């Protein structure tokens, strides 16, 4: 079982699309895209994803990817 990274389709246009594309290439991650993750207020502010159900955001796609990997490393479950 790999870490689950969930993206909101509405947030992809806010900058998380590039992060999703980078993470999709990592065979050690399960990357999913959903219609809405119910984080509407935060969704409009910055790129974000849920990592194993926990909210992780960044100022841009590059920072989001860095923070996702840092979160996974700090919270190793597998």
From Swiss-Prot:
Pfam families: DUF1450 (PF07293). InterPro entries: DUF1450, UPF0349. NCBIfam families: PRK13669.1. Belongs to the UPF0349 family. This is UPF0349 protein BPUM_2879. It comes from Bacillus pumilus (strain SAFR-032).
